[in-house]
Amino acid sequence: MQRPDMSVAVAGIKMRNPVMTASGTFGYGAEFADYLDLECIGAMISKGLSLKPKAGNPTPRIVETPGGMLNAIGLQNVGIDAFIEQKLPYLKNVNTPVIVNLYGNTLEEYGEVAARLDGLSGVAGIEVNISCPNVKQGGIVFGTDPGAAQEVVRLVKKNTTKPMIVKLSPNVTDVVLMAKACADAGADALSLINTLTGMAIDLERRRPVLANVTGGLSGPAIKPVALRMVWQVAKAVKLPLIGIGGIMNGRDALEFMLAGATAVQVGTASFLDPSAAQRIAREMEQYLVDHKIESVSSLIGALEL
């Protein structure tokens, strides 16, 4: 058979294959150019960008755990203006869609960052991180309150013409409720899941390992949770989904597609193997060849119950 068709599209963003890089694990893209061919992956997602530069949390802020890692980086980034001036020019010369992940500490910040990206060439879409505390509302996380999440999504939608992916938090009682709220507010696609909140303790020192005390758990340990949430949301919402959580190889990625994801994001795997995203895309294609499957899109939601 001829080579299988690996192309997919998420909210109008056409990709050569379903493998995207997860925000916060791939720098701004250029940092990984020596380790893999940036034009062999589906899309690149930037570090989370805020209105102003952010220094992040004190160290230590990363710790390995059984089956994964905890991070409390604190959304360190150069700020939206520096990204546009210093990082985006390089990315414009790469023939791979660039999606900008953005966040805010207030509703207004989300809207302002989205507005600054609107109309820019070289940005195929935006991913909205709603797992941030609303400093004007006592620190409640936008992504754990359906009403607050809808406010963010509506404002970003108002301020941009670019496709909008909303990244869902798993730290909720009902992820389907959050997914429906974001869909109703105008999300064009959903990515899930973000990290699970966890902590690590140093027994000898009787202190938390992370300076921030808690952090976000990622890696293979969260994959079963992520698969379950993707499957649940796929049954409830008619939007393209991007699966995230513990994807280390091509088989992992294809499992997410069976559960209902159109594409996947590779995150923690890139810390262990900087070329992971390209390798996973290659492994997915080889699986299709071995099983005589003509198109990867035929696997989306093809789970048999």
From Swiss-Prot:
Enzyme class, broadest EC rank: oxidoreductase
UniProt cross-references to SUPFAM superfamilies, sorted A to Z: FMN-linked oxidoreductases (SSF51395)
Active site positions, chain numbering: 132 (nucleophile)
Annotated EC: 1.3.1.14
Any GO BP: 'de novo' UMP biosynthetic process
Protein name: Dihydroorotate dehydrogenase B (NAD(+)), catalytic subunit
Family, per entry: Belongs to the dihydroorotate dehydrogenase family. Type 1 subfamily.
Catalytic activity: (S)-dihydroorotate + NAD(+) = orotate + NADH + H(+)
Gene3D superfamilies: Aldolase class I
Pathway(s) served: Pyrimidine metabolism; UMP biosynthesis via de novo pathway; orotate from (S)-dihydroorotate (NAD(+) route): step 1/1
HAMAP family recorded: DHO_dh_type1
Pfam family membership, one: DHO_dh
Disulfide links within the chain: none
GO molecular function, one term: dihydroorotate dehydrogenase (NAD+) activity
Keyword terms, alphabetized: Cytoplasm, Flavoprotein, FMN, NAD, Oxidoreductase, Pyrimidine biosynthesis
Co-factor(s): FMN
Record-listed FMN binding positions: 23, 47-48, 101, 129, 167, 193, 219, 245-246, 267-268
Residues annotated for substrate binding in this entry: 47, 71-75, 129, 194-195
Keyword Ligase attached: no
Protein task: Catalyzes the conversion of dihydroorotate to orotate with NAD(+) as electron acceptor.
Record GO cellular component, one term: cytoplasm
